[in-house]
Structures are given as C-alpha cells and as structure tokens.
Amino acid sequence: MDKLFTPGKIGKLTIKNRAVLAPMQMMYGEHQGYAGEKAIAYYEERARGGVGLIIVEGVNVDEVNNKPWNLQMSLASDKYTASFQPLTEAIHKYDCRCFVQLHHYGAKSAPTAAGKAWAASEVPVAPGGPSAHKMTVEEIKIVEQRFIDAAVRAQKAGFDGVELAGSHGYLLHQFLSPYYNDRTDEYGGSIENCLRIYTEIVQGIKARLGKDFPVSVRFCGDEFTPHIPKTRTVEDAPAIARVLEAAGADVLNVSNGNNFNANANCEPYSYDSFWKAHVTRAVKEAISIPLIATNTIKDPLVAEETLEKGLCDFVALGRALIADPFFMKKAAKGDVVGIRKCIGCMYCREQLYAQLPVKCALNPRVGYESVYPLVPEQDGAGRVVAVIGGGPAGMQSAVTLAKRGFDVTLFEKEDTLGGTMNLADKGPHKEKIARFVETMKAEVERAGVKVLLGKAPSIDEVKALAPEGVVMAAGAAPIVPRIPGVDKPHVCTAYDVISGDVKVSGKVALIGSGITGLECAEMMLNEGCQVAMIEMLDAVGTGMFSVIINDIMSRIKPKDPTMYLHTMLTEIDDGYVMVKDVKTGEEKRIEADHVVLSLGVAPRADVLAEYRSAFKNVICVGDNAQRGRIPHATKEGYIKSLVFLKD
C-alpha cells in the first residue's frame, strides 16, 4: 500500500499520507453551537488512528438566515472561535492536518425568526414543501461575507484550511443545480454564473487570509437523478472543476447526489466500490490541482487501488473511520483483517435522519470516546467468565472481558463463530457482513479467548469451569405461530431458506416482511419463485430505516411479487394458505407450494432462566436479551461487559 502512505501536498501544506476523514455531520456539538468534549474526543481518536487530514463536519456560518440542525457546531460569530482551539490542538498532536467545512442549509433550513429560508430561488427542497426566499444580489453578498468571516475564525482557531460545503443539496449546491436555480441574473444560467457564489467566496477568503491559506471546495460531480429534470450530470463535472480551479481553489473534493438521491453519497450495502469511479476520473482529468474523492472505500486495499488507478490524489474515508478510527494504523501494519470494515447498514444515517448523534453498528464507542476508555480498566485479575453464544454480542462481550483481564471461555453450538450474522451475510448484496464476522473472529483469537465450538454446553460443563460470572448471548429463536398446518413438511422459516438448508420453488407464500423477510423474498424471486408477500401491517419493512427498505424494494418490485397488506395468516394446508384481511375481515385462499415464515424472533427465555437458577452472576446480551440488530448486539456486549463483575 505504498501510494496510500505517500505524503501529499495541498498548496504548500504537506499531508503525511493520502487518507482524508470526509466531513460528516455527527451531531456531536454542544447545544449552543460550541465545540465541546464529545466532538474533540471523536476527532482526536481519528487523528490518533493515523489519518493524514481531517475535514471537520460542516459548521454553521449564518445564525440569522439559516437554522442549523440540532447540535451542529458553529463559526457564525466570534464567540465560538475559542471552543475550536482545543479541537485543532488535539488533532495536531498526531501530525494530522485539519480543515473545517463551512456550511449553509439554504432551502433545506427551517424558517428562521427572520422569515423563510434563503436560497437561490423559491423552489422548495421537495415538491409540495415550503417555498424558500429567493435571495437578492445584496443578500447573496451578505451570505458570501458570512462564509468569509467564518473562514477567518477557522484560521484563528488553528485550522490549516477550510472547505466549502458545495454539494449534497445545501445552499451552494442549490445555486449550482439548474433544478433549484432558475435565476436569470449573474448568479444563474451558465455554469460560470451558477458557480459565481462559490468563486466569489473562494476569492474573498484568499483576499482576507492570503493565497497560501488552503481552500477546498466540495461539489457535486453527478446528481444521479435522471428522473428529475434539469440536474447536473458527469458531463458537467469537468467544466465545473475547471471554473473552481481558476477561482483559486487549492483542492477539490468531489461527491455526488442531491436531495432526491442521498444514496449517491451515502450508499447502502448494495452498492459496490468504484460504481461512481467514472465521475472521479472525469474530474481528475480536467484539473491540475489535487482531488479528494469518495469511492465507497471501506478497505485499505480499495483505497490503494483507487490511488493506483489515478482516480484521485487523496481518498476520502467517511463511514470507514466511524467504524474503525484506527483504519490507517492497522493498514500500515498490513492488518487488513483487524479493521472493522463498515458494512453499509446505514445505522449512522438512520440516527442522523432522526436528528440524533451518530452511532455505529460496529463501533459501540463512537460518540462516547470521552466516556468509554480505549483500553478498559485491567480489573479482571484472571477471574473466570463463561460466555454462552458466539454471535456479535457474545464475541464483543468475550473480547471486552478478556481485555479487562478475565479468563474467558466462549461456547458456540455451531461449528463456527458469527451467530445469525452467518445467515445475514447470505442475503443478496449482504456479503459485507462476512467481513465483520472475520474481524470479530480475529479479535476473539487475539484477545486470548478460549473458544469451544460445535456443541451447546450443559450446565454441568459450564459449572466445571467454576466461573465467577456467565454472559448469556445465546440468541433468539424464530417465532412460529400456533395455527393449523404450521407443522406441515412444506412449511419452513426464512432462516432455512437464506441458509440454503431448504430449497423452495414454484408458488411461495412468505409470511412477514421485516428485513429478513424482504431479503428472503428477493432471494426467492431471483431464483424464479412466484412470491406472495403476506403482511399484517399496512406497509412492508415497518420499523426499519426507510433508505434500506426502499433500496431492497427497488429490486423486489420489478420482479412483481403479489403483496397482501393488513393481512393475517389463519391456516396452512396442502397447496394453499388461508388469510384474513384484518381491516375488513374478508378471507382469501392463496395457492402455495411452500410456506416461508418470517415473523421475527423471540429471546430464548427458557435457556436464560436455566442459567440464572444455576449461577449467581448472569447478564444477558444481544437477541437473548431483546430482539435487536447488530448495533444493539455490539453495544450491549461492550457496555455490559465493561461493568460486569465490578467491585
């Protein structure tokens, strides 16, 4: 990985390697807009982890005509500047450079006390939404000055450079996009005019801070919305890049997507690396200044390949460094398997959309770096602990306890560790989960955990260890309803199908449409089955993040399954099932050669009760505690094991 670890330059600024922490809203600011302990600890850990340049998430530049999200940090006035100095000092301790992104929501802002959100035109963010205030030329100059003033504050706070947030549907992008910009003055029409607000801000910053103060511009290379009229495509990207370079930008940071397609910049798991490489290449070939680019990079080998192909000069690592802040240090040692590689589950984005601080399914410490120690207290003193179950919660518990100095034995009834993740990675496009399983296996081994596979232990076998405590992580069992015919041989669970233990064909009645049910439906449709999806609720995927559901349904719907909503299974018989509309009471017979149950799981309460009656100190984590997902499993396994058997 020679190229990844070769120093690079942005203007006169030397960067120790080619990895950049991409700017991502984390919601780690203080309530008043200050940078506080939470943000400082988060960014310091990424600097400690070896990245060359950190671009701190977008900070607000306008408190009058822009309403930021909850917990967004701000450089909109001088009162905030001092709060960022500890942040830049913390980053610089590790020979890491830092920029800060300057941000304005534009039409995406909620109305402020001053009135409607300011934007390029009155076009609302989404059809039917509130219209924005079309800025006058005088108002554009006011906002430009607010960006420039924020850059001055950034320099005073110790930042090495700044970046303009000119992508992802925010104010500057609203000027660039013909969909939002219907102006006929000098700020609309041609690419040069649509970029005028960008170029005047860049030139204004240079005039105030000098030509050697680096300015990055993040812009949209392709909005990837062919169904929306008048949007930017890759054909526009080279011309956009050349205008920005001519204006004095020191580096460009190309991203993609807009308000109609955020998946183009924060992709679900179904997207592969290099899917948008053609955009990056088009920009790179058009400019002579350095280029930062995302490439759905979750693996250092992909980062190296991106650089080797000449697609960019610096690779932007976003969710990869949320999942594992030590990505670069591990890569430098060649420890690729030791990196917790983002699986694209979108839990981080799900939190953000709910206006909550970002969390990560794979990294339970993210956002809590100042609370949970990187190295836990060594208080195990060789005491014995048994962990029952080798899924994500069990493995995380075992590793955490071993790091505390406990003597840990992990029991797993299957022949390999991983638990339900070994099924989750079998669904279409879910191969990335296997990477996490392999990393967790490596962590278990490196922590010195004793692993016993292939048999569920008896109580006596566990007692023979004389454990001081037991961690129950035995998972959950599929729910099977008590209805006539459920025990017939053509009835199975979604787990049976996904694992490959049962092959189905012909007409299939799928009962339930949670995430597992939808993945099973996609698998069966891909194999040519005629699938009838039967769901008691009014929509499929209820309770799951809409982005993931929409991504899966975009592949399921074209295969034309039959869908029955607010419909309950009442009986199974040979060749058919009986269902009832829960709203009207109407009964219906649906032909089915196979019936696949996907009704969720229930904790193994009987196993838990047995262990609690046999041992004094028992904690329960993961699905064994409550039905959950990978983020719940890793968080419970980590946090509960940090405090288990404390004096």
What do these predicted ranges mean?
Residues 1-8, 37, 366-372, 450-456, ...:
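Short gly/ser/thr-rich secondary-structure transition/capping motifs
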Residues 95-96, 213, 289, 467, ...:
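A short helix->loop->beta-strand "cap" motif at the edges of active sites that frequently abuts
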Residues 343-364, 488, 559, 628-631, ...:
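Flexible, Lys/Arg-rich cytosolic regulatory linkers and terminal tails that connect or flank
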Residues 1-388, 392, 397-403, 407-408, ...:
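Flavin-dependent oxidoreductase catalytic cores
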Residues 22, 101-103, 165-167, 173, ...:
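Generic beta-strand/beta-sheet core signal
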Residues 301, 379-410, 452-469, 473-490, ...:
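Rossmann-like dinucleotide/flavin-binding elements
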Residues 407-447, 521-569, 625-628:
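Rossmann-like dinucleotide-binding cores of NAD(P)H-dependent redox enzymes
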Residues 287, 310-311, 447, 487, ...:
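Short, structured coil segments at secondary-structure junctions
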